[in-house]
Structure formats: C-alpha cells, structure tokens
C-alpha cells in the first residue's frame, strides 16, 4: 500500500466535477517552464483532459486544479487501494485520489501557490474594483451623439456625391496643352466636349436666387452659362492662336468644375440652407479656392509631388500650374500645405468636417448673420473634436484638432496669394478671356 499525505486527515470524496470548476485560486505561470505554442492543444498533465492554463505551477484542467487546491487546504491523506501506480485519465480520475494527488505533485504543482481565503477575497475585491474603474472610465469617455453621427453621415454622403474619384468628367474640359519645355506631355482626346466661355455670359451667374436653381444631385449643366455642349469638330479654343499660358484653358475649366462641386457639397451641410442666399454666396466666394485645395489633397501624391487625377493626361505637376499663370509664391507653400495635410493621415470623416468648418467661417467678408454662421461652425467643431477623441487612436490623435485648425490658417494665406495672382492674370485680356464665367464671378468680384 502506498499512502499520499497532505499533512494528515482524510478528504471527502469528490462528489461532482462542477464543484471543482468553482475554484477561484490564482492561476500561475510555471516556474522555469519554456514558452509554449498557443496554437497547439494544451493537455492536462494529470488526467489528459483539455487544459485551461498553468495552475499552481503546472498545466492542468479546471478539475485537477480544484482537486489539488482542496486537497492541500484540507491537508488530505489518501491511500491507494491498489499498487500505487494507477494511470489517471479523464474518465477514472475520481477513482483513486491518492494516485491523482501523487500525479499532481509529480508534474510540479506546488501548494505555495495556493491562496488563502483572505487572499482569494482580496483578489476578488481587486477584480471587482478594476471592473468598476473600467466601467467608470468607459462611461466618462466621450461619445458621438446621435445628432453628431448624423451630421458626419450627411457630410460623407455629400462628399461622395460631389467628388468623383474616377475623374471621368475631366474629359469634358478643354484639353491640357503642355509646352515642349514641360517635363510631361499630353495627347488631345479624340472628341472634346467644350463650354461656351464668352465673358458676356458672366452676368448673374451667382445671383441671389441661383441656389434654388441648382439641381440635385450635381450635374454637368448646373449653370446656364456653363452649358457643356458637344462640338461637332473642334473646340472654340482651338481656333485661336496657342496662348502664352497653354495650360490656362484646361485648368480654368477644372477650377470652374471644382467650384460647382464645392457649391453642391456646401448645400448639403446641415444648417447651410438656414442662411440667407446672400450669406451663402459670401461664404462660398471666400472659401471656394480653400475647399478646392483641401479636396485636391485626395489626389495629391507625395512620391512625385503631383496631383494624379486618373490618366497621365490629368496628372498635374507644379510645372503645369506655372503654365496656367501661377508663380512659385503660391505653388511652393501650396505643395508644403499638401504634404503637411497628407501627413496628418486624416480619416475621411475628419476631412469632410474640416471642409465644412472651412466653409462656415463667420469672419468671411460680406457675411451678415455672423452669429448664425458661428453657431453652425461651433457644432461642426464640437463634432470634429468629439470624433477625434472617440475614433482616432493615438499617437495620431495627439494635438490633431489644433493641427487641423492651423491648416485652415494656412489656407487663408494661400487664398490671399491666389487672389493676388488671379488679379494679375485677369488684368490681361488675352488671359482673362480663357477663364469661365463662374471663375470670373467667384474670383473676380471681391467682396469688400
């Protein structure tokens, strides 16, 4: 006969497996045990059942964990009725407690790892306290309200409706013409869809009741003055001598098209339609070029510092924009702005909120109801700040809101430089005649 003692006394027979599963002692890593592969099934070292982890310094199942804990705490002494070398399995582990306890000791289970009742109670209290702290922390964490989430969803939809990532409409512009000195060349499209660009049609393009006439969703024929009609043979721009600024006609069409899309986006901003038509126009005239610069970041590529809008014909480098009349006084800070904005890695939600905040700026010239504009912008700003705290993980979220607001300040400087260069361009008739009525209306008649 072989006796296995746990410091004297007999333990009551194990009446049911469920009692063993109620063990609450601390699970401990095995002393000196090498790392194991978590993908490999873990087997209890005592009975061969599925193990749940290291318990009291050995890999065991919940049943053997509970059996060892009770045996040690009760100082049980078991006697094997056989030869003392019973094979312990999942099915017979309750038949011989002596050999089962011996097996527990043999695989390295140690009573020193067993918690006292007081330690168990303290552990339970610590766990409960930690859960309560986590619940409190979660409850204090800012959350987007239903209204804020609705605003974000509306802005996302507005952006998707007014920003074509295929850039298919670019084929409707007067074709890009790059001089032989440019680093890139472009071929003309076989069929060119052009616009009637006579400056005589510029009257009342942006009239006070123009907003009510804009169809939704946005379509090419948004403005009566900008009818995109197909020409049978060649564009009117092909009948004149190649201008000194060969890219101006194409980029003028691109900017005109972009203004239309900005107007469409603005109309869907919650609260924008609550403003008077005069204030809507004032906001759009002042912010249009800034929002275009913001939106263009989606096509900006840092690898070669270009704007890629589909095919190579519509891949724009700084040299292309200089051939439309702009100087490095604008382009150098513009590229720097694009790089900085790209590095912020904004979520699309943050991007559309920034565009809306840019448009709804109460300090724009000509705005009458500044308090209403400010209240709309404040709601958008609050939504952006809450979104960053809730959805933008660190470290990218650190000071992100402040960095985004700084980008709006940078846009003001770019806007000012663009206006200066536009005025120089528009004072030259041979260049101003290449501009569209909408471009002339938005950038030409400055609000004082």
Curated annotation (Swiss-Prot):
The keyword RNA-binding does not apply. The lineage of its organism: Eukaryota, Metazoa, Chordata, Craniata, Vertebrata. This is Vitamin D3 receptor. It comes from the Eukaryota. Homodimer in the absence of bound vitamin D3. Heterodimer with RXRA after vitamin D3 binding. InterPro entries: DBD_VDR, NHR-like_dom_sf, Nucl_hrmn_rcpt_lig-bd, Nuclear_hormone_rcpt_NR1, Nuclear_hrmn_rcpt, VitD_rcpt, Znf_hrmn_rcpt, Znf_NHR/GATA. A motif (9aaTAD) lies at residues 437-445. It is found in: Nucleus; Cytoplasm. Zn(2+) 2 binds at residues 80, 86, 96, 99. Residues 147-444 form the NR LBD domain. SUPFAM superfamilies: Glucocorticoid receptor-like (DNA-binding domain), Nuclear receptor ligand-binding domain. Zn(2+) 1 binds at residues 44, 47, 61, 64. It comes from Coturnix japonica. SMART domains: HOLI, ZnF_C4. Keywords: Cytoplasm, DNA-binding, Metal-binding, Nucleus, Receptor, Transcription, Transcription regulation, Zinc, Zinc-finger. Residues 41-116 bind DNA. Transmembrane segments: none annotated. One of its GO terms (molecular function) is nuclear receptor activity. Composed of three domains: a modulating N-terminal domain, a DNA-binding domain and a C-terminal ligand-binding domain. A zinc finger (NR C4-type) spans 44-64, 80-104. Calcitriol binds at residues 258, 295, 299, 326, 418. GO terms for biological process: cell differentiation; negative regulation of transcription by RNA polymerase II; positive regulation of transcription by RNA polymerase II; vitamin D receptor signaling pathway. Residues 117-146 are annotated as: Hinge. Belongs to the nuclear hormone receptor family. NR1 subfamily. Its main location: nucleus. One of its GO terms (cellular component) is cytoplasm.
